[in-house]
Design a protein with these regions (language model features):
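C-terminal interaction segments
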Residues: 309, 324-330, 337, 390-452
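A generic short-segment signal for beta-strand/edge and adjacent turn/coil regions
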Residues: 43-47, 58-62, 74, 333-338, ...
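Non-heme di-metal
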Residues: 2-333, 379, 443, 449
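Low-complexity, glycine/alanine/valine/leucine- and proline-rich hydrophobic stretches
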Residues: 287-317, 367-414
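Intrinsically disordered, low-complexity segments enriched in small/polar residues
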Residues: 14-17, 356, 381, 388, ...
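Acidic, aliphatic-rich amphipathic alpha-helical segments
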Residues: 311-381, 435-452
Length: 452
């Protein structure tokens, strides 16, 4: 194995008796992470799911409010189901890893994920009283999983199948991105942060708190591995970089929709002392740090990968994202999309920032005229793009539709060609610009352009 970046004495002193308080390796630059150090941390941080005593936690669970228990079932179900799914899915990752050091670490991670699943199974069985067996416990969680969550984990299942058939470096880069950067860094780590924070302060479920601290420490190590692998792959291969971008574009609609509580009842988060805006903002900060550590900051990614202005404060970005979700622009189908001047401003700002300005060799204006909402247009000129409310003085291309129909095309995958035939989408103007739209906006991004 390569030499470690930390000495044994440094590692031991940083870890302490149980590893709590140790530096988060997942935030280090990839070049400062070694596979040897990651493996050593696994040996030193080992813990036993069956050493936890849940007797006091059962009393603590009963002391929670009805809303806190209801919310807890929703949150912990995502963790329990996810830990089982990733345990099942790691084998093809081990086979596809190009380096022996990577295979060894992934083998330790599979053990970790199984231990996490056992921890959550014990909690569900002994504290909540749900499921005598692992299978029964997992069946209990399934109705509580949301659309975005199912989309991400459904993609993990197909990714594992793809990795069995294709062990190329670009496919491996996609697989690591999905597992370590999307599932662990973007989904699990933010949830762990807020759950752990609440129960450490409350002190009424000590075994659960200790288990969550252990899980969080393991996940930091896993994410650190993902940062290390991707920093190597993306530095060596433009093909790997393109494959990662392709996956990020594919997963954006699902990822933005995870952690939406049932029926949009925000008491599911407020009852634990945090808002949805806070968890979304914290997640954004965390993920941006990981991509910066990889050496591929989100600001350098192509248009449309993350279509919110990275210069905007995280809290404002989180608020805007949630407004699009509540309006039915992002997220699962939930009736006709809502429209308001504010929603349109947010939406078209995203559309403008998603434009590939290099796809046109002269200024282009694309206009949307809605039968039931205000008109907007996007101007692409000299390597920049901007969204403007109102009709353009001179548009190269005008797209006429109702707001609801346009969102069906843009966000739900409705065929533009079929909508044209049904006269629910009426393009007017330059055929050249119309043909160029799939180059300006990648197919099935937030603009709804589909290459047909």
């Amino acid at each position: 194995m390569e030499s470690s970046t930390a000495t044994h004495s440094e590692t031991t002193s940083a870890q302490g008796s149980n590893g709590a308080g140790r530096e988060d390796i997942s935030s280090r630059p990839g070049a400062q992470i070694s596979y040897e150090d990651l493996y050593r941390r696994w040996e030193q941080g080992n813990w036993k799911a069956y050493d936890l005593d849940f007797s006091q936690d059962k009393v603590g669970w009963e002391s929670l409010t009805d809303m806190q228990r209801k919310s807890g079932l929703w949150l912990y179900s995502m963790f329990f189901y996810g830990e089982d799914a990733v345990t099942d899915g790691l084998s093809p990752y081990i086979d596809a890893a190009p380096k022996e050091e990577q295979k060894y670490f992934l083998a330790t991670q599979q053990v970790d994920e199984a231990r996490h699943a056992v921890f959550f199974h014990r909690f569900f069985k002994e504290v909540i009283g749900a499921g005598d067996t692992l299978a029964e416990g997992l069946a209990f969680t399934e109705p509580l999983l949301d659309w975005g969550y199912r989309g991400v984990f459904g993609r993990l299942e197909t990714m594992c199948d793809e990795l069995r058939a294709d062990r190329s470096l670009p496919k491996f880069a996609q697989a690591i991105t999905l597992y370590h950067l999307i599932i662990e860094a973007s989904m699990a780590q933010p949830g762990q942060h807020f759950i752990e924070d609440f129960f450490i302060k409350a002190g009424n479920m000590p075994a659960f708190s200790e288990g969550m601290r252990n899980v969080a420490r393991d996940e930091q190590r896993h994410i650190g591995f993902g940062v290390k692998v991707l920093s190597e792959l993306l530095e060596e291969s433009e093909e790997c970089r393109a494959a990662v971008v392709e996956l990020l574009r594919e997963m954006l609609p699902y990822l933005t929709s995870v952690f939406i509580p049932p029926d949009w009842d925000e008491e599911y988060t407020r009852c634990y002392g945090f808002t949805m805006e806070e968890i979304f903002a914290w997640g954004m900060k965390s993920v941006e740090m990981k991509w910066k550590a990889i050496g591929y900051p989100m600001q350098e990614m192509p248009a449309g990968v993350y279509p919110f202005d990275p210069a905007m404060p995280h809290e404002e970005r989180a608020s805007r994202q949630l407004k699009l979700l509540r309006a039915g622009i992002l997220g699962p189908p939930n009736g006709p999309a809502k429209s308001s001047p504010e929603i349109q401003e947010i939406y078209f700002d995203v559309v403008a920032k998603s434009a590939n300005t290099e796809a046109v060799d002269k200024p282009v204006t694309v206009q949307w005229k809605f039968s039931d909402a205000d008109p907007w247009h996007v101007v692409i000129d000299n390597g920049s793009s901007r969204a403007v409310q109102g009709e353009a003085e001179k548009a190269d291309l005008t797209l006429k539709a109702s707001w609801a129909d346009w969102i069906e095309i843009a966000m739900r995958g409705e065929s533009p060609g079929k909508m044209v035939l049904r006269r629910r989408l009426r393009p007017r103007g330059s055929l050249r610009v119309l043909r160029r739209l799939p180059e300006i906006w990648e197919p099935r991004e937030i603009t709804g352009v589909v290459a047909e």
